[in-house]
């Protein structure tokens, strides 16, 4: 994956993270019991969004940002690409789940609430995946710094 493609992938993810964080905030007000989980997801998304934005800036200003002198088989750029795909799958899963909870109505009535069931375990799993992806990216970036 060349530097332009990598930076483009990161910028696309930044937008997706921002969208999902905004949706988290919108859904949070409707599901009071889910506030802590949604806050955690939103905070992770916002932190990762900022980190990925900085990574994109770095890649745009330093073409060697995704290289390492120890990468003799030239596998790091492919690993980075797979990491970005993992983030993309994770964020799409979160956004899809949040979209089912989002309603155009300001306040949900009883019937509206009955139609949608808060899935705490599923949302915690999304949060866990998001944190795992962040940990994997952090490890990869540490390798790139050597």
Sequence positions of predicted segments:
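N-terminal amphipathic alpha-helical segments
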Residues: 1-75, 79, 104, 141-145
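Amphipathic alpha-helix face/heptad-repeat signature
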Residues: 9, 13, 37, 41-44, ...
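A generic short-segment signal for beta-strand/edge and adjacent turn/coil regions
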Residues: 9, 98-99, 105-108
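A structural signal for well-ordered alpha-helices, especially hydrophobic packing surfaces
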Residues: 45, 49-52, 56, 81-84, ...
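Regulatory helix-to-disordered linker/tail regions at the edges of structured cores
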Residues: 85, 103-146
